[in-house]
Amino acid sequence: MKIKPQIIGLPPYKPGKPMEDVKRELGLETVVKLASNENPFGASPKVAEAIQEALHHTAIYPDGYARTLRDKVAHYVGVAPEELIFGNGSDEVIQILCRAFLNEQTNTVMAEPTFSQYKLNAVIEGAELREVPLKDGVHDLDGMLEVIDENTRIVWVCNPNNPTGTYVSAEAFQSFLAKVPEDVLVVSDEAYVEYVTADDYPDTVPMIRTYKNLVVLRTFSKVFGLAALRIGYGVANQALIEKIEPVRPPFNNSTFSQVAAVAALEDEAFVQSSVEKNNEGMEQLTEWCSRMGLDYFPSQTNFLLIHVNRSSDDVFNAMLKKGYIIRSGRALGYPAWIRITIGSKEQNDGCLAALADVLAEELTTQHLS
């Protein structure tokens, strides 16, 4: 058997250990996970009710076109139903775009570091990667423009960016979009858009009317609290959606994910409460960092990337022993930084107290700048 050469040696995705495994291995009664940017307040109670009702229909294939959800999302974002494509998480929409546009003769442009799935899917399709380093944690749009050529097919803008939490302003994004060739796809990945508070964040969805090469990605995994159900979507002009729709696998969104997403959209109060609590938690973390003299990237998301000035792996392991799962920055391109998801006030209090203890200890590691 001959596998694609670019897949040989490609490491599989390695999820973090389940909390139950961590409890057992370290002898802990409780473990708090603040590593994957999930909603610490869960999902709307209406979601559980919708799933309970859907249990009566497990023998029937889901609606392959997600009609009810499609209409609900179309109203939510202000587009026509035909301007949407749904995926098993926005990860799958990324995969669909890469399958549709990339091959061995093409290249794709992205920031470095940014969300890992752009790179992974491009490698699988055999495309050349053109990674442009961030400037002060923010996309270098001018640098990205410079590396676009006749073989470029997709440019990725993670906005706000993961792992830094920083964002590209409306003025900068629109100027960038106007300069990208019309035959190059621009993907604005907005997984954290509901958390954004910046007044000058771009309103990208209306831009699909002007820019036929723009795709906007959104997800239900973050503020809506549906990470376990895997549902996301892309927004683009109808002609583009029609071109990529054949690449989408059939029945890729389960009945449960569809009814859950509809229910989540209907509970605006839950979303608003989650956003308000996140804002309070973000203020709690940033004020703590300032008191501790720790640098961080100003974030428009539900996580904060913090400079701890030492091996992030060591800090991660020390925090794990105290019952807190955070994210080491080593795999994210920041070996002396850690990423912490904003939790509830109680979770934040405990995590910050544990982190203060860890940073006060003499870690037998080489300090990194």
From Swiss-Prot:
InterPro entries per the UniProt record, alphabetical: Aminotransferase_I/II_large, HisP_aminotrans, HistidinolP_aminotransfase, PyrdxlP-dep_Trfase, PyrdxlP-dep_Trfase_major, PyrdxlP-dep_Trfase_small
Cofactor: pyridoxal 5'-phosphate
Superkingdom of source: Bacteria
Gene3D superfamilies: Aspartate Aminotransferase, domain 1, Type I PLP-dependent aspartate aminotransferase-like (Major domain)
Ranges in a coiled coil: none
The enzyme's E.C. designation: 2.6.1.9
Keywords assigned by UniProt, alphabetized: Amino-acid biosynthesis, Aminotransferase, Histidine biosynthesis, Pyridoxal phosphate, Transferase
Protein name according to UniProt: Histidinol-phosphate aminotransferase
Species of provenance: Halalkalibacterium halodurans (strain ATCC BAA-125 / DSM 18197 / FERM 7344 / JCM 9153 / C-125) (Bacillus halodurans)
